Amino acid sequence: MSIKISAIALFMLSFTVFVNGIPFFLTKGRIDTCKTLTGETIKIGESWHDPNSCSVYYCEVNSLGAMLIGKTCATVFYPSNCREEPGTGLYPDCCNKVVCGEEEMVVYPYEERSLRRYYFSKF
């Protein structure tokens, strides 16, 4: 009898440890909000601009729950006769601009967040 009770107690302890090991966003908090890097709470569909980097985050939901999806400036390779100038403001205005001679080009990501391609647009 004592062995059976010990086995049941061990099973219950193992189950409790397993359940508490599930990722935080699946077991705690709300599934309709996201927490930003600075601790603010935003709702699904809302965006948040990171004050410490040139990026924007969107609160989205998928099969795992609510999560932040981020966008930041593109890494740009340009000819030697061009240079980068810093941008100002919030994303995407804070992204560096590429200046080649008298022409200025701004690098924009495609609107579809799943694609990691970028295009150039004359300013």
Swiss-Prot record:
The UniProt entry's sequence similarity note says:
Belongs to the scorpion La1-like peptide family.
Supply one GO molecular-function term: toxin activity
Location, primary (coarse class): secreted
PTM comment: the record says:
Contains 4 disulfide bonds.
Which keywords accompany this UniProt record?
Disulfide bond, Secreted, Signal, Toxin
- Its recorded name reads Venom peptide MmKTx1
Question: What highest taxon heads this organism's lineage?
Answer: Eukaryota
Q: Which SMART domains match?
A: SVWC
Q: Which GO terms describe its cellular component?
A: extracellular region
Signal peptide (from-to): 1-21
**Keyword Nucleus among UniProt keywords:** no
